Each structure stands twice: as C-alpha cells, then as structure tokens.
C-alpha cells in the first residue's frame, strides 16, 4: 500500500503572474509558458486584474521602469489559457479602491476563474505611520470582506515591507492590522521575503498570524555572485528557492501547521540568466522536493 502524507502536505504550488509579464505577449507563446509551469510541478497561477485586462501604454511603461513589467498579456483570453493548460487560479489580486468601486464585477470575475480568494495587493499613496489612515483602512477592509463573504468569497491582505512601519503609538502598522481587522472578514497572504527585507523574522510573524495566514508568497534572498567584488559588502536580492539564505524549511513547517492552502512563488527581478522561466523551473525543483505528496 502506498503511504499517504499528512493532509497539510498537500499545499498547492503556484506562480504569481507578475513573473510572466515579459513572456506572455501572444496566445501561443503564453500557452507554452503555462505548459512549462505545469510541467515544473505547479498547480496554478495567482492572477492580477491589471494583467488580465488591457492597460494603457503609460501604465505598462511605469511598471517596466519600476522593475515589474506587466507586458501585453491583458488582451489575451486568460479563461481559455487557464483551461487548456490544466492550471487552476489560486487567487485574484486587485487594489482596494477598484474592489470598492467594482465589487460586483470583481466578484463575478473571481467566480469565473473558480477562485474564492480576492487579495488586496497593498496600499499606494498611503501613510503607514498614521493611525487615522490605518483605522480608515481597517474599516474599509472589514466592510469589503463582509461583502465578499456574503458572496461566498474571502478577502486577503498582501504585505510588503511598509507594514512594519512604526506608528504614533509605537506599534507596527501590521500589529494594528492584525488586531483590528475581523478574522471573519479579513485574512492574510503573507509575503515572507518583504518582512525579511525589512529586517524582521518571518517565522515569528507566520506564527503570530496562525490560521489567518491563508496563502504564502515566497522567494529566497541572497547574493548572486557574478564578478570579483570591489568591497566586502554586496547587494542581497531575491533568489530562486533553496539558493539563498532564508529559513525556508522552517517557514514551510509553520505554513503547514497554519493550514496554508497554497504557496505562491513571486520574484520580479534577479532571475537566473535573467530568464523568468528558468527561475520558475529551478524554484519548482525545490518545491517538488520539499512539498512531497503521495497518492
């Protein structure tokens, strides 16, 4: 009889769509990319609304300058591409303002992709140190989460490093977010890379989140040595899983204890050979080795 692993080892493995902006311009090219992702052991994608709808050239130019090119894939039929590739959609990323203005349309779009998770990508033009702004954000998140729950969906908040800003009370913004949002309506997609980038211990925060951590954004962090160093201080950046210095094995154990539903690979720069697909495939090898399942 084939031995079965514990249920918590059956975490889905996915790729964040932001990694695909430079390789998903045309239908056939994109289908080949998705097939390679599937063949590398991934179960699904995490889609971004701004990448599955046409966006102005100015917006695409700004994202490229920022190091996160969204590409020209917004004109493609992503429903067909997902179906043919055999991948699933883990969640749908959007911004809070769009969700509030287009709630019904976004709910229907999520359901059309057979996902029950809407993720807020973080706040822009926002003072992370101001308690009044944070209180307003919490009210908005709770309200949006309640509406989504009534439609059978759930709301998650995705962090970067700004959430570790200390506010007027001396607490970190993320502390207040955890304390004041309603677990019934608001939960979290935890990005361990960004908290490590800010000097925090991702493992401690994952333990603090507990079962409110529904999805895990992951990439490794380290130094890609390419030439003789002029000084002993080199720049650390995102790396393929298992090639950097983060305690990914320990994080994986905590994610399993928390009952995390999916681990989502995301890096938007410093890819091996500057190739996102090679990066995805290399990280996929680590994921397959680490998240073993038996049927």
Predicted regions mapped to residue ranges:
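Aromatic-rich peripheral "rim/lid" segments of glycoside hydrolase catalytic domains that contact
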Residues: 269-295
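N-terminal pre-domain/capping segments
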Residues: 2-117, 187, 285-295
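Acidic-and-aromatic substrate-binding clefts and catalytic sites of carbohydrate-active enzymes
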Residues: 20-28, 47-73, 94-103, 125-135, ...
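Conserved beta-strand positions
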Residues: 15, 47, 92, 120, ...
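Acidic/histidine-rich catalytic cores of soluble enzymes
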Residues: 45, 148-245
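Active-site acidic/histidine proton-transfer and metal-coordination neighborhood
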Residues: 75, 88-187, 277
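Tryptophan-centric aromatic hotspots in well-structured domains and transmembrane helices
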Residues: 18-20, 42, 93, 157-158, ...
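H/E-rich (His + Asp/Glu) clusters that bind or coordinate divalent metals
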Residues: 244, 251-252, 262-266
């Amino acid at each position: 009889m084939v031995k079965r692993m514990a249920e918590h080892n059956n975490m889905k493995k996915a790729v964040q769509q932001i990694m695909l902006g430079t390789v998903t311009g045309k239908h056939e090219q994109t289908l080949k990319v998705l097939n390679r992702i599937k063949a590398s052991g991934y179960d699904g994608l995490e889609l971004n609304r701004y990448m599955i709808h046409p966006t102005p050239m100015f917006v695409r130019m700004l994202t490229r300058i920022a190091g996160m090119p969204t590409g020209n894939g917004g004109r493609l039929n992503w429903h067909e591409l997902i179906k043919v590739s055999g991948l699933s959609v883990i969640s749908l990323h959007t911004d809070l303002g769009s969700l509030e203005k287009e709630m019904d349309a976004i709910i229907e779009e999520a359901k059309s992709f057979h996902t029950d998770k809407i993720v807020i990508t973080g706040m822009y033009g926002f003072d992370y140190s101001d308690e009044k702004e944070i209180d307003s954000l919490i009210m908005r998140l709770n309200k949006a989460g309640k509406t989504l729950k009534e439609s059978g969906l759930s709301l998650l908040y995705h962090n970067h490093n700004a959430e570790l800003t200390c506010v007027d009370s001396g607490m970190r913004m993320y502390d207040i977010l955890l304390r004041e949002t309603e677990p019934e309506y608001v939960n979290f997609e935890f990005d361990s890379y960004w908290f490590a980038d800010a000097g925090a211990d991702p493992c401690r925060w994952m333990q603090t989140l507990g079962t409110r951590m529904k999805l895990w954004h992951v990439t490794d962090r380290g130094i890609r040595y390419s030439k003789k160093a002029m000084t002993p201080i080199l720049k650390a950046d995102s790396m393929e899983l298992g090639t950097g210095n983060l305690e990914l094995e320990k994080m994986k154990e905590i994610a399993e204890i928390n009952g995390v539903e999916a681990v989502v690979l995301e890096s938007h720069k410093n890819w091996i050979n500057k190739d996102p697909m090679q990066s995805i495939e290399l990280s996929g090898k680590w994921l397959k080795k680490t998240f073993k399942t038996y049927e």
